[in-house]
Amino acid sequence: MSSIEEIYHEAKSDKWFQGFALFCRIVLAASFFPTGLVKVMGERFAEGLPSNNPLGHYFDALYLTGYYYTFIGIAQIIIAVLILIPRTSFMGVLMYFPVIVNICVLTYATRFAGTRANTMLLLGCLFLLLWNYDRLKYLLPFKQPKTDPPVIKKPLGIRLRIIFFGGSIAILTFIIIGTFYLWEIGPGNSEAECRNQCFGSKNPVACEEFCDCIYKDGRPLDSCLAAFNKKKNIHIHYKPRY
């Protein structure tokens, strides 16, 4: 058995890691159950998000898809329940993974303010996939050699906890800080939130016009970004003559 497998089996037998895996399962289930219930009840998801917001356009269109919208809600509830049940948690995590990847891509593409939370959910899902590697490996297109019962020769003990949780804190810090500086401008979750960023902007006029483009004109995000960049470049290259 390789050293990586030894570390894996040591983590699986550690109560701290077991508790963290349970915590991740609860969080993932909690992220899907209420959102799925909203769809099943026939209500628009994220009602507080304006229709002219880039992600609001998507939610409006999705809401008008009829029974497909209901189907998504039912699927989310089923996934949440499967994740909570120990015997079916692995199946639930497998179903959760492609959905949360799609959600992450969507939120980053529309510059949604909740990208941090969705990224953390994706990381939690990846942890649970690794946690269930003893099952996952049989689904991979690789020949799996027969292994003897795990015998941990040199346990890391508390060092393993420190390395893992220290690394987790570092990753979360990177995500929080990194996403804060990811975009120069974004639509925010409301018109007021969009305009708040203009106070500290290097190009406040271009920023205000961007917010008008999004929330007053209702134009696509790419079109508004192109207009913002054009206005910004004119401001940069303009040199007044005296």
Regions found by a protein language model. Give the residues of each.
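Membrane-interface junctions
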Residues: 26, 64-65, 84-87
